[in-house]
Amino acid sequence: HLATTAQNDCAVTSQALQNAYSDAFDTWVRASHLRFGPTEVDDRAFALAFWPDSRGATPRSLTTLLTEKDPVIASPEDYAQVSIAARGFYAMEFLMYDETLSNMGDEDDEDDRCTLVQTVTKDIATTSAAILEGWQTDYAARLKSPDTSSTYRSDEEVLQELFKALVTGLQFTSETRLGRPLGTFERPRPTRAEAWRSGRSARH
């Protein structure tokens, strides 16, 4: 839905695009703690959600692509080879909501940004489809039917994997999603919150 919307309306101020982005991001966040199996192949989880980005790799990578008018901007097939920081939902957030990147340049730059939005959303769709296919064609069956010759040898090992994912997800929320922006009493750091530019932090 996000990629389709972007093909029809790639303006970063488009309400339809913003709504589709938020819906797609919500879908990912609900499953983002399941960091095993298909999400870990080819760093797919990072390709969808490269955060935290303490060194500013995402805006730097996107700025380079746009200022150098890199041909990869118009090539969804090749875009999977760019820096992982320039991919996924946080790259889209910068393109849509960052004051500098969303307003950068002249009319030609606006066309490039529009094309990049379309390419990033197609890349998100491709990565998401690969994860879904991995679950549907193979990995779900491994969890449901453990076997001594399979990834999971018993129901107990399946439960351990799921419990580990849950605990790790809760720790990430506590230490990173909440801990980073809270900082200290004397020095809170709200701009370290996840997805603060799009006003989504509390949804995560």
Q: Could you tell me what each predicted segment is?
A:
Residues H1-H204:
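Mature extracytoplasmic or organellar-lumen-exposed domains after removal of signal/transit peptides
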